[in-house]
From Swiss-Prot:
The modification Valine amide is found at V12. Mediates visceral muscle contractile activity (myotropic activity). Belongs to the periviscerokinin family. It is found in: Secreted. InterPro entries: Periviscerokinin. It comes from the Eukaryota. Its main location: secreted. This is CAPA-Periviscerokinin-1.
């Protein structure tokens, strides 16, 4: 999604 790659999980 938006922060996919920045956070350890995309959008749960």
């Amino acid at each position: 999604a938006e922060a996919a790659g920045l956070l350890p999980f995309p959008r749960v």
